[in-house]
């Protein structure tokens, strides 16, 4: 019997009708759905309610129902266990999602027949160090961003790669992105589009106050060090636009490729460049 986690975005599936239809399909195919305890209770499936850790660590795969934001959240939770994600789009853009809702059951049939591949996506790891002590760490599938607050002045951030000085960014912030994240915030800030399965790290300043500052692409083996080099800077570090931490003067942020990957289930032979044109045109 397969154990399948089902993670809905309840803001996009408000009445949980989509989730119920997926759970029904799983039960009809001799599978045990693993649901968040609150969601399970709302649906009348208390017996399938599980602790969050059990959902991500014990499921054979996860069905994520939502948009790219849902996938980014699920990806960070799945990564320590390597649990594959089948991403179903209930949003409007869906760069990361594999299928729309009208394709979900045909696609699940394919998965159960073994007609799928698993695509590995590189992730980033960030560690914030204060007074020589690690304070907090993050993982991200898309990007790690240092940005100024709503009313603060221009940020001043010293950047190094493998202890080699790169630049002092006078900007609204700096984006450190994966190839997956190259079509997200980094793209809006003028960064390059990178094929998603290539492994590189992209450094993109946000609105730099200079004539020459451009994105830099470095090796996945490189370690990026960012230093908050001036007092009275209202700066935040955020990961995938979902987790955040306030930074202080002299804080140091180390960013490198994570040892963990996001594993995305693929049932379609989608051409990345077709997807790129379609999704960016939709915007």
Swiss-Prot record:
Cofactor: a divalent metal cation
GO BP of this protein: NAD metabolic process; NADP biosynthetic process
Database matches in SUPFAM superfamilies: NAD kinase/diacylglycerol kinase-like
Localization (cell): Cytoplasm
Reactions the enzyme catalyzes: NAD(+) + ATP = ADP + NADP(+) + H(+)
Residues binding NAD(+): 68-69, 142-143, 153, 172, 183-188, 242
E.C. no: 2.7.1.23
GO molecular function: ATP binding; metal ion binding; NAD binding; NAD+ kinase activity
Keywords: ATP-binding, Cytoplasm, Kinase, NAD, NADP, Nucleotide-binding, Transferase
Catalytic residues (UniProt): 68
Assigned GO CC terms: cytoplasm
Gene3D superfamilies to which the protein is assigned, alphabetical: Probable inorganic polyphosphate/atp-NAD kinase, domain 1, Probable inorganic polyphosphate/atp-NAD kinase, domain 2
Family: Belongs to the NAD kinase family.
UniProt function note: Involved in the regulation of the intracellular balance of NAD and NADP, and is a key enzyme in the biosynthesis of NADP. Catalyzes specifically the phosphorylation on 2'-hydroxyl of the adenosine moiety of NAD to yield NADP.
Protein name: NAD kinase
Organism: Thermoanaerobacter pseudethanolicus (strain ATCC 33223 / 39E)
């Amino acid at each position: 019997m397969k154990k399948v986690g089902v993670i809905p975005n309840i803001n996009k599936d408000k009445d949980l009708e989509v989730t119920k239809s997926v759970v029904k399909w799983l039960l009809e195919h001799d599978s045990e759905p693993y649901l968040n305890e609150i969601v399970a209770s709302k649906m009348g499936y208390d017996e399938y309610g599980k602790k969050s850790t059990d959902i991500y660590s014990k499921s054979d795969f996860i069905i994520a129902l939502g948009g790219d934001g849902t996938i980014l959240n699920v990806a960070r939770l799945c990564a320590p266990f390597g649990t594959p994600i089948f991403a179903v789009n209930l949003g409007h853009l869906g760069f990361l999602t594999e299928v729309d809702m009208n394709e979900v059951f045909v696609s699940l049939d394919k998965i159960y027949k073994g007609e799928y591949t698993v695509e590995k996506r590189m992730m980033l790891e960030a560690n914030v160090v204060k007074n020589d002590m690690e304070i907090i760490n993050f993982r991200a599938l898309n990007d790690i961003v240092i940005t100024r607050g709503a009313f603060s002045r221009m940020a001043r951030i010293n950047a190094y790669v493998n202890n080699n000085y790169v630049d002092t960014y006078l900007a609204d912030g700096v984006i450190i992105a994966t190839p997956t994240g190259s079509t997200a915030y980094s793209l809006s800030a003028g960064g390059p589009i990178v094929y998603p399965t290539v492994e590189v790290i992209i450094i993109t300043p946000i609105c730099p106050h200079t004539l020459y500052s451009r994105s830099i692409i470095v090796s996945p083996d490189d370690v990026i060090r960012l230093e908050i080099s001036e007092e009275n800077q209202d700066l935040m570090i955020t990961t995938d636009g979902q987790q955040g931490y306030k930074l202080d003067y002299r804080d140091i942020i180390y960013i490198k490729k994570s040892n963990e990957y996001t594993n995305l289930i693929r049932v379609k032979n989608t051409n990345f460049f077709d997807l790129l044109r379609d999704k960016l045109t939709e915007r």
